Amino acid sequence: MVEPRDTVIREEDLNPDFLEELSELVEPVFEEEEVLSVQACYQCGTCTGSCPSGRRTSYRTRLIMRKLQLGLVDEVIKSDELWMCTTCYTCYERCPRGVKIVDAVKAARNLAAKKGYMAKAHRMVAMFVIKTGHAVPINDEIREVRKNIGLDEVPPTTHRYEEALEEVQKLVKINEFDKLIGYDWEEGDLVD
């Protein structure tokens, strides 16, 4: 069941400069025009109507875009819905205004992560990358399938080459990705 939302928008919650600030913050990854394209959204709902994730979750693309336009920073970066986008780009392909919706969502996710708001599932995937070098680590079932189709049970990746995994972990530490997701090296787990 969808929970009722607080629909009152207070003037003090608005940040009309949020898109500008967001575009400056994420410039090394996203072009300013990608984030600022959100301003062109006229709330037709095509994005929400075509979103495969929105059919199965509470994710409403149009609502995220509107909150970005209004500068409702906390509502955007603290929402679980922000992490429900699968980045399939269906919304972008169908948007009549060419709004770079997925890029704006990813930029907002970057900001959310920097401020300590990241979905547990995303943190878990990141932990798997740190521990194994893979978002989806190999398991016994996959080993068996590989063997049955004539492949080596262990693929020639970080699963086979310990030095490659060490390189991945070295990059994680250099970029402080471990701190971003709250990974404890001694415990080998996430810190909540």
From Swiss-Prot:
EC code: 1.8.98.-
Taxonomic lineage from the root: Archaea, Methanobacteriati, Methanobacteriota, Methanomada group, Methanopyri
Known role: Part of a complex that catalyzes the reversible reduction of CoM-S-S-CoB to the thiol-coenzymes H-S-CoM (coenzyme M) and H-S-CoB (coenzyme B).
Cofactor field: [4Fe-4S] cluster
One GO CC term, this protein: plasma membrane
Domain 4Fe-4S ferredoxin-type residues, every copy: 32-61, 75-105
Cofactor note: Binds 2 [4Fe-4S] clusters per subunit.
Alphabetized UniProt keyword annotations: 4Fe-4S, Iron, Iron-sulfur, Metal-binding, Methanogenesis, Oxidoreductase, Repeat
Subunit relationships: The heterodisulfide reductase is composed of three subunits; HdrA, HdrB and HdrC.
The protein's enzyme class: oxidoreductase
Family to which this protein belongs: Belongs to the HdrC family.
Record-level GO BP terms: methanogenesis
Record: residues binding [4Fe-4S] cluster 1: 41, 44, 47, 95
Entry GO MF terms: 4 iron, 4 sulfur cluster binding; CoB--CoM heterodisulfide reductase activity; metal ion binding
Pfam families hit by this protein: Fer4_8 (PF13183)
Entry superkingdom: Archaea
Entries under Gene3D superfamilies matching the protein: Alpha-helical ferredoxin (1.10.1060.10)
Binding site residues for [4Fe-4S] cluster 2: 51, 85, 88, 91
Pathway(s) the chain acts in: Cofactor metabolism; coenzyme M-coenzyme B heterodisulfide reduction; coenzyme B and coenzyme M from coenzyme M-coenzyme B heterodisulfide: step 1/1
Protein name: CoB--CoM heterodisulfide reductase iron-sulfur subunit C
